[in-house]
Amino acid sequence: MKTVSQLIDMKQKQTKISMVTAYDFPSAKQVEAAGIDMILVGDSLGMTVLGYESTVQVTLADMIHHGRAVRRGAPNTFVVVDMPIGAVGISMTQDLNHALKLYQETNANAIKAEGAHITPFIEKATAIGIPVVAHLGLTPQSVGVMGYKLQGATKEAAEQLILDAKNVEKAGAVALVLEAIPNDLAEEISKHLTIPVIGIGAGKGTDGQVLVYHDMLNYGIEHKAKFVKQFADFSVGVDGLKQYDQEVKSGAFPSEEYTYKKKIMNEVNNND
């Protein structure tokens, strides 16, 4: 399992860091078997796994439930679990209680929280021993306000993002996720920080990349963002389900190959 120090060392050696989301035991097992460096249990599970319209409906209980499953499936991978909407920003005491509950009950290596406004929370969480990954740029929990669009696209916005990135690092963040920002801006931020910067829709100038498992494998999704490359096609599973349906209806399944050979009814009838 990678440690924070090893991830920082990868950045220093210019070794790119791979990160993929996982939301359950089997997907986590696959990601670990592939040798991916980090797993993100993202609140994107609301759409990909639970069928919600957005991340807004995801609860702390949802994140704990799925985080536990992922840890069981990937015991040797660095796991980061998202703080869902409403878990940060109420009061510092409640925020820290939520963070501690999520961190302890999932046995994660770190938690992730969105936005530049959480800098005080990062400081306090770090002080009590909870590693925090920050998330800037497009923050899905705020799409109701900012929408799904490129962030940092003006001079003022870019300068603010650079400042925000420096501030979350200063507050103690162990890594930073940058989403949907210009490539050159992401590269500039990565150069300014000592912590690993993981990009999603932020070009190749970051220290690593993260993609959503279901997006990159075409698993039950209807829309892919511009920055998503499809690496496999899990939708072919539908063909297998159709074949199963046909074989059940025709009587072709189960054949002798898939049937126990033991005969028992003669013994039952002889006892009558």
From Swiss-Prot:
Cofactor section: Mg(2+)
Reaction catalysed by this enzyme: 3-methyl-2-oxobutanoate + (6R)-5,10-methylene-5,6,7,8-tetrahydrofolate + H2O = 2-dehydropantoate + (6S)-5,6,7,8-tetrahydrofolate
Entry EC no(s): 2.1.2.11
GO CC terms of this entry: cytoplasm
Family matches, as PANTHER family: 3-METHYL-2-OXOBUTANOATE HYDROXYMETHYLTRANSFERASE (PTHR20881:SF0)
Function summary: Catalyzes the reversible reaction in which hydroxymethyl group from 5,10-methylenetetrahydrofolate is transferred onto alpha-ketoisovalerate to form ketopantoate.
Protein name: 3-methyl-2-oxobutanoate hydroxymethyltransferase
Organism listed in the record: Staphylococcus aureus (strain MRSA252)
